[in-house]
């Protein structure tokens, strides 16, 4: 079977073009998000002058926090976008809620925001999970 079922015999019948376009758009979105995540966290956490081939403890911790915060913000933006799709933007309420939650976390846990709903995932795990997610698209 070829990439995304194009040009080959599909045993389940003809592919729905809308599903194909949706799958391609989703793949583009996930790839773009991953690339922006890597670029942003690499720029913030890893010094330009490499002294070692491995991450030190501070770099690893910084990357873990950066990834967790990135996904937390991405989730919140998605929630606001979904409300916008329903015609109920509620941006002011959402901003106040996010600000209040961040302030509460800062008071409870110190100056770094404790992301409560995002599991701490190591960067190599994100790469692995992304490849597992993308593998059906690239390797079928």
From Swiss-Prot:
Question: What's the entry's take on its domains?
Answer: The twin CX3C motif contains 4 conserved Cys residues that form 2 disulfide bonds in the mitochondrial intermembrane space. However, during the transit of TIM10 from cytoplasm into mitochondrion, the Cys residues probably coordinate zinc, thereby preventing folding and allowing its transfer across mitochondrial outer membrane.
**What broad taxonomic lineage does this protein's source fall under?**
Eukaryota, Fungi, Dikarya, Ascomycota, Saccharomycotina
Q: What does this protein do?
A: Mitochondrial intermembrane chaperone that participates in the import and insertion of multi-pass transmembrane proteins into the mitochondrial inner membrane. Also required for the transfer of beta-barrel precursors from the TOM complex to the sorting and assembly machinery (SAM complex) of the outer membrane. Acts as a chaperone-like protein that protects the hydrophobic precursors from aggregation and guide them through the mitochondrial intermembrane space.
Family, per the entry?
A: Belongs to the small Tim family.
Keywords assigned: Chaperone, Disulfide bond, Membrane, Metal-binding, Mitochondrion, Mitochondrion inner membrane, Protein transport, Translocation, Transport, Zinc
Q: Which Pfam families match?
A: zf-Tim10_DDP
Q: Does the keyword Kinase apply?
A: no
* Placement of sequence motif Twin CX3C motif: 41-66
Q: Which gene encodes it?
A: TIM10
What's a GO biological-process term for it?
A: protein insertion into mitochondrial inner membrane
Assembly and oligomerization: Heterohexamer; composed of 3 copies of TIM9 and 3 copies of TIM10, named soluble 70 kDa complex. Associates directly with the TIM22 complex, whose core is composed of TIM22 and TIM54. Interacts with the transmembrane regions of multi-pass transmembrane proteins in transit.
Q: Provide the protein name.
A: Mitochondrial import inner membrane translocase subunit TIM10
Q: Which GO terms describe its molecular function?
A: metal ion binding
Q: How does it sit in the membrane?
A: Peripheral membrane protein
Q: Which InterPro entries match?
A: Tim10-like, Tim10-like_dom_sf
- Listed as disulfide-bonded, the cysteine pairs are 41-66, 45-62
User: According to the lineage, what is the superkingdom?
Assistant: Eukaryota
Which residue spans traverse the membrane?
none
Q: List locations, semicolon-separated.
A: Mitochondrion inner membrane
CC per GO annotation: mitochondrial inner membrane
